[in-house]
Swiss-Prot record:
Highest taxon listed in the record's lineage: Bacteria
The keyword GTP-binding belongs to this UniProt entry's keyword annotation: no
Protein name listed in UniProt: Large ribosomal subunit protein uL15
UniProt keyword terms in alphabetical order: Ribonucleoprotein, Ribosomal protein, RNA-binding, rRNA-binding
Species name: Desulforamulus reducens (strain ATCC BAA-1160 / DSM 100696 / MI-1) (Desulfotomaculum reducens)
Length: 146
């Protein structure tokens, strides 16, 4: 068997229907568009979201909220992800970036207390959760806010 001898499985390929090519085709004469009317015309049809004149869904619901331009983009990371570092390492946002644990520093880095820290680390970031501080000190490390 060669690549040039390969054939599609029976029934895998279906010929496209040629609309308007005789009434025997089943899609002749009006080509599935019905008689006259907006949808039978060239370029006919209603725009997306048009509901026949009734108030569209998009306009029935009220506007809500706003975008706070002063919102802080704080990058969060869980405690168990810090186990990749050697004991005694000083963990900073720059080190987390280099290690690929975070994608960007943004407006700061926050350590969350999910998981268990198995090594004594000095962690210097912008914010900590209460449980994260407790677990870092329990492991023999230090949590410093920069």
């Amino acid at each position: 068997m060669n690549l040039s001898e390969l054939r599609p499985a029976p029934g895998a390929r279906k010929k496209p229907t040629r609309k308007g090519q005789g009434i025997g085709s089943g899609l002749g004469k009006t080509a599935g568009k019905g008689h006259k009317g907006q949808n039978a015309r060239s370029g006919g049809g209603v725009r997306p979201g048009f509901e026949g004149g009734q108030m569209p869904l998009q306009r029935r619901f009220p506007k809500r909220g706003f975008t706070n331009i002063f919102k802080k983009q704080i990058t969060a990371i869980n405690l168990d992800e810090l186990n990749v570092f050697e004991a005694g390492t000083e963990v900073t946002p720059e080190l987390l970036l280099e290690a690929g644990l975070i994608k960007k520093v943004g407006d700061g880095v926050k350590i969350l207390g999910d998981g268990i820290l198995e090594k004594a680390l000095t962690v210097k970031v912008h914010a900590f959760s209460k449980s994260a501080v407790e677990k870092i000190t329990a492991a023999g490390g230090k949590a410093e806010v920069i």
